[in-house]
Every structure is written in structure tokens, then in C-alpha cells.
């Protein structure tokens, strides 16, 4: 059988198998940071009040952000079906958190810069994060 020279082999791009970490670490670091940040300063109570949420729900959002970020990282470290499931579970948990942020805070403005009508900015950043989360949900550890 003849070797197909038009298709590059995995050996031609040895870093390709690690490229998924760019998506994982970028997405997970934002989630873990935002989750931890909700416990700092004025904390979960102020976040909950700003979002018109019960404090317990604000607490669960903060824990969800930390947990889903850690799951996406952990899933990438485990090279079997369990790791794939952990990656997908983490990404699945991120989607409703991001949709909540988009629809409750950022909807109506695309650009991320703050304005008088959207002091926390528009939904560009959250939509990008949602697309990365959906990609990891769809691809799992085959990303």
C-alpha cells in the first residue's frame, strides 16, 4: 500500500495532540477564577443581590464555576472513557452558567465593553466561552 504524502501525519505536527490544552486551560481558568472571585471581597451575597438570585443559588453558581473548570482540566488528564466523560460533564455544566450570564446580564449588547445600558459589558466574551464549552461537550477528549 502506497503512503499518502498529501495528508500530513501526526508526526509532522507533534504538538497537535496537546493543542486541546489551549482551549481547556483558557476556558477552565476563566471559570475557576470567576468562581473563586465570587467568594472574595463582598462575596456571594453581593453577586446574588446583583443578579436578583437567592443567596443559595449564587453560592451554587460560584461552586459550579469552580467545579466545572476543574472537571474540564481533570478530564484532559485522564486518557480513557472516564476522562472523556469528565470533560463532557464539565463542559455540559458550563453551558447553563454561561446562558444564565448571557440572558440575565449581557443580552442586548454584543460588544464586551461596558456602556450605560450594560455596565458589565455585552455578550461577546460569554458567547465565545459558550462555543468553546459546546465544542468540548461535543468532542470530549477527542478535541
Question: Where are the regions a protein language model picked out?
Answer:
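Membrane-interface extramembranous regions
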Residues: 2-143
Amino acid at each position: 500500500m502506497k503512503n499518502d504524502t498529501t495528508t500530513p501525519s501526526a508526526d509532522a505536527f507533534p504538538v497537535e495532540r496537546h493543542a486541546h490544552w489551549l482551549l481547556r486551560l483558557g476556558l477552565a481558568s476563566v471559570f475557576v477564577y470567576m468562581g473563586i472571585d465570587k467568594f472574595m471581597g463582598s462575596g456571594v451575597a453581593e453577586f446574588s443581590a446583583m443578579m436578583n438570585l437567592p443567596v443559595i443559588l449564587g453560592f451554587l453558581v460560584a461552586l459550579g464555576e469552580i467545579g466545572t473548570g476543574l472537571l474540564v482540566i481533570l478530564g484532559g488528564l485522564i486518557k480513557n472513557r472516564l476522562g472523556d466523560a469528565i470533560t463532557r460533564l464539565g463542559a455540559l455544566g458550563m453551558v447553563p452558567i454561561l446562558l444564565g450570564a448571557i440572558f440575565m446580564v449581557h443580552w442586548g449588547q454584543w460588544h464586551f465593553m461596558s456602556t450605560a445600558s450594560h455596565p458589565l459589558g455585552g455578550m461577546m466574551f460569554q458567547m465565545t466561552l459558550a462555543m468553546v464549552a459546546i465544542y468540548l461537550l461535543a468532542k470530549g477528549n477527542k478535541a
